[in-house]
Swiss-Prot record:
Full protein name: N-acetyl-gamma-glutamyl-phosphate reductase
Catalytic machinery residues: C149
Keyword set, alphabetical order: Amino-acid biosynthesis, Arginine biosynthesis, Cytoplasm, NADP, Oxidoreductase
Family: Belongs to the NAGSA dehydrogenase family. Type 1 subfamily.
């Protein structure tokens, strides 16, 4: 039985890790931390866990945690993770980090979008944890950087086209919409019910959203050359889910039937990517509560552009579910352990 610690367990990604790991036959959660809620039982913070967990939230003390856990999930805010991850690694623990602290390979790029990195040497060692593209490297990694939610939906949506060089990378536009849980659990005026309900707004407009360098880094690796995309995120008044609509001009003549076949071949055997039939498109309603990424696509007959639509649950395939998928790979477990739940409906 793998003993697991969740560092930063009182946020939305923390509760999702606890919920999903409860059904994992090879895992026992032995330690949970929260600086703000230390001393409280997790069921006080998340009543949904009543009678299923009897864990008390602790202060973050890496040495004590490492004594009781074999594997660490860090679900901390950006910057906070880099303060503790090196210690866990030195103590011989393997880590999946759910923050953005280790997703970028270039320390200068990280500093430009966030702030100077405290341990830039680890940026080269961390493996970007998108299992469908990095499975072999994830299996050998000590530190996996769990991808962001928007990047997951966009990279999976574009990977087959870029790998086969079927689109002009300079024409890529990604228009994505997210539920409010993507902003985290801390109290913010912009996320209050009266501020969000009955509204739909763009934010991070004009190439300033922090997920951009992560998206461009991974798409550039797929394309084999540096690329720049246009990305605009939107906030939708729903709890969870991301729907990304992606546009790109083909590099040559394409057919819809050929594109669907390409995607099915590319994702053949993948447990959590579902390619829909021609002219069928995903909905966040059908992936809610699951680790699936649903992808549909078409060719706009008027403009010739390829249109890809992808849907994920931002808290699961976009965060905690993907983190568990990475943990499974790192420990030689079947990849789908603990992640077989179908989406909630309605």
């Amino acid at each position: 039985m793998l003993k697991v610690a969740i560092v930063g367990a009182s946020g939305y990604t923390g509760i999702e890790l606890l919920r999903l790991l409860h059904g994992h036959p090879e895992v026992s959660v032995t330690c949970v931390t929260s600086e703000q809620s230390a001393g409280k039982n997790v069921a006080e913070i998340f009543p949904t866990l009543r009678s299923r967990y009897n864990l008390v939230l602790e202060n973050l003390e890496p040495v004590r945690i490492a004594e009781r856990a074999d594997f660490i999930f860090t679900a901390l805010p950006h910057k906070a993770a880099m303060e503790v991850v090196p210690t866990f690694l030195k103590l011989g623990k393997r880590v999946v980090d759910l923050s953005a602290d280790y997703r970028l390979h270039d320390a200068r790029e990280y500093a430009a979008w966030y702030e100077p990195h405290m341990n830039p040497e680890l940026l080269k060692e961390a493996i970007y944890g998108l299992p469908e593209l990095r499975r072999e490297k994830i299996a050998e990694a000590d530190l996996v950087a769990n991808p962001g939610c928007y990047p997951t939906s966009i990279i999976l949506g574009l990977a087959p086209l870029l790998k086969k060089k079927l689109v002009n990378p300079a024409t890529i536009i990604a228009d994505a919409k997210s539920g409010v849980s993507g902003a985290g659990r801390s109290a913010k005026v912009d996320n209050l019910y009266c501020e969000v309900n009955d509204g739909f707004k763009a934010y991070g407009v004009g190439g300033v959203h922090r997920h951009i360098p992560e998206i461009e880094q991974e798409l550039s690796l797929l394309a084999g050359k540096q690329l720049t995309i246009t990305f605009t995120p939107h906030l939708v008044p729903m709890d969870r889910g991301i729907l990304s609509t992606i546009y790109a001009e083909p590099a040559g003549e394409v057919s819809l039937a050929g594109l669907v076949e390409l995607y099915r071949d590319f994702y053949h055997g993948e447990a959590f990517v579902r390619v829909l039939p021609e002219n069928n498109f995903p909905s966040t309603a059908f992936v809610r509560g699951s680790n699936f990424c649903d992808i549909g696509l078409t060719v706009d007959k008027r403009t010739g552009r390829i249109v890809i639509v992808s849907a994920i649950d931002n808290l699961i395939k976009g965060a905690s579910g993907q983190a568990i998928q990475n943990m499974n790979i790192m420990n030689g477990f079947p990849e789908n352990l603990g992640l077989e739940s179908l989406g909630l409906f309605p």
